[in-house]
Amino acid sequence: MSGSFSPCVVFTQMWLTLLVVTPVNGQHEAAQQSVVSLQPPWTTFFRGEVVTLTCYRFGFSVPQKTKWYQKRKTVKQTPGALVIKAHTLKVHESGEYWCQADSLLPSMHVNVEFSEDFLVLQAPPAVFEGDSVVLRCYAKKGIEAETLTFYKDGKALTLHPQSSEFYIHRANLKDNGQYKCTSKKKWSFGSLYTSNTVVVQVQELFPRPVLRARPSHPIDGSPVTLTCQTQLSAQKSDARLQFCFFRNLQLLGSGCSRSSEFHIPAIWTEESKRYQCKAETVNSQVSKQSTAFIIPVQRASARFQTHIIPASKLVFEGQLLLLNCSVKGVPGPLKFSWYKKDMLNKETKILKSSNAEFKISQVNISDAGEYYCEANNSRRSFVSRAFPITIKVPVSQPVLTLSTGKTQALEGDLMTLHCQSQRGSPCILYEFFYENVSLGNSSILSGGGAYFNFSMSTERSGNYYCTADNGLGAQCSEAIRISIFDMTKNRSVPMAAGITVGLLIMAVGVFLFYCWFSRKAGGKPTSDDSRNPSDSEPQEPTYYNVPACIELQPVYSNEPEENVIYTEVRRTQPRQKHADQESESPRSRCQMAEKK
């Protein structure tokens, strides 16, 4: 265990602290406490020598104000202790010393001893595993190295070559024990000098690390952070550690690093295996490994949320259809695919967030069907429940017709209105109107339109129309005007027509009778011997173109006892001399009663 280490290199600064530590990133950062250092880094000296104590703030910064203590009293300028600077104290008197930097907690106590013996064994105040330790056998006067002997627990230690320094490389628990040294007196035979006894107790530099996972129960595919937790000894808080992480004894990442954390972007159920970490000093003097730790990876449970615009899942042809899929409980990044039934539909998006949209600017009837989205995180696929999308065709302008085909009706007639849209998805609501007043409505689930029956009345004469609506908005038909006749108010019309026709018939009858009578009067009368004059009477010639009858007004009176004598009065007109007249006009005859 001998070597050629120089104590000035190994123990140039030995930081002695009494620290309260808190875990930070696996190592431990000292709380705000004061720190004391010794130079030279020993605790045993010969009387008359001087040791320098220096007080620092934690982190080895120079404090603004320092207080030194010995035996629970404040150290002032005394013959035994000389204050050189505010944070430095030179000591040549045995005792316990500590300091307080500014308002921090006091440092640990340092026990400094000044001996009057001829031979002393000098050792550092503390030994930690992995340290390179020097034990120096030191005499007041020069001694010959070949006369020195080191002992551990009463057993002599062999040094090659012989030296006044004993080296312990990579100190560990097997180096614990009681050490001392002896030397022969110069020019003396059989006389030995024996040093003081130093107890070496190798302290643990840091405990065995513990591996932690955050989160402790990760979800399949989610990121995980592994932390290798350990705690450096308070007096060795300036030691530098590095950390390594393993899965099934295979080194993770690019190797060991100063970070006590290792990030796994995604952990899967098949990787739920044995994990370990290792903490070691940068020079690999001390290395410790954690126990195996199995990370319980849970299967991901996808919770889908789908948002649809329009929210009713009922879309009219030509409208916008917007589908949005969001997933919780599944780690990303995710790739989203939209499916219609069993076939991939048009558009796929890859997003770092857990949202994806699928958009159809103008839907048509072929876009109807069941849709679902799929989220994939490169290892797992998660599928949402399918939801139906119904595409409706807006109704066209309806056509209003009459069953009779006539727009005129009599009061009391039964009328049937028929309203039908040639295009439109059911269910269609038809409504009938008279002069903007609703008459009734009907919902039709299939084609054929709707009918409305009503009995006409005088007040129902006017404009009729209908509307059709299947959810997008009502479409209005052209108006039909129906005229109504009231027979009780219009009898004068047929009566006047009847009278006119009757008068015409009577006029025609009178005219025909007149013609007949005139023709009858123009013929020769039947001979009557009793009434005709004798044949010897000269007869006046008769002419045509004379009035048929000239009424004579006789003056007579009837006496009851006398006989009535009928006379015939004949009037003749002179013959016209014009030769162009063809015949004689018939004689007019009028009969009258004459009194004798």
Swiss-Prot record:
Transmembrane stretches in the record are 497-517
Q: List the Cytoplasmic topological domains.
A: 518-596
> Which residues get glycosylated?
324, 436
UniProt modification remark: Phosphorylated on cytoplasmic tyrosines; required for interaction with protein tyrosine phosphatases and protein tyrosine kinases.
Gene name, Swiss-Prot/TrEMBL: Fcrl5
Origin organism of this chain? Mus musculus
The cysteines covalently paired via disulfide bonds are 55-99, 137-181, 228-277, 325-373, 419-466
| Compartmental location | Cell membrane
Q: How does it sit in the membrane?
A: Single-pass type I membrane protein
Compositionally biased region (Basic and acidic residues): 577-596
GO BP term, example = negative regulation of release of sequestered calcium ion into cytosol
Q: What is this protein called?
A: Fc receptor-like protein 5
State what the entry records as the consequence of deleting this gene.
Mating of knockout (KO) female and wild-type (WT) male results in 30% KO/WT pairs without fertilization output.
Subunit architecture: Interacts with CR2. Interacts with CD19.
Tell me, in one coarse class, where this protein mainly resides. Answer: membrane
One Pfam family matching this protein: Ig_3
